[in-house]
Amino acid sequence: MTSLDQIIDDFAFLDEWEDRYRYVIELGKNLPEMPEVSRTSENKVQGCASQVWLVTHATGDAEDPLLTFEGESDAHIVRGLVAIVLAIFSGKRASEITRIDALDIFGKIGLIEHLSSQRANGLRSMIRRIKSEAEGRLPA
């Protein structure tokens, strides 16, 4: 999977929206395929116009576990957005995930203003889902 730093660097070199759009699709193509068995209603992200599934894996410290995520979508551009979301959040501690401003990152790479309202809402739903998963893994 492409790292967030690499994604940010790559976006810095892409001036045209069409090039960025193609790059997002390419990121989605490089996303590992989620097993069919994981594409359940429980893993489906609510609030996305396209179908999106997220699976959370927790390891390590029970007080502040390391979370990794798998994601999938049936739409090419959304699959690319999933890849970026996973690059932002996957492999981080739950406490760190709760503090990340992913929408700010999407704004800095110039994607937010080019997303349709439906895609932007779906992106927010993915982020909320991941943050909720992280918050649920932390002690009250």
Curated annotation (Swiss-Prot):
Belongs to the SufE family. Pfam families: SufE (PF02657). This is Uncharacterized SufE-like protein R01000. Coiled coil: none annotated. InterPro entries: Fe-S_metab-assoc_dom. Gene3D superfamilies: 3.90.1010.10.
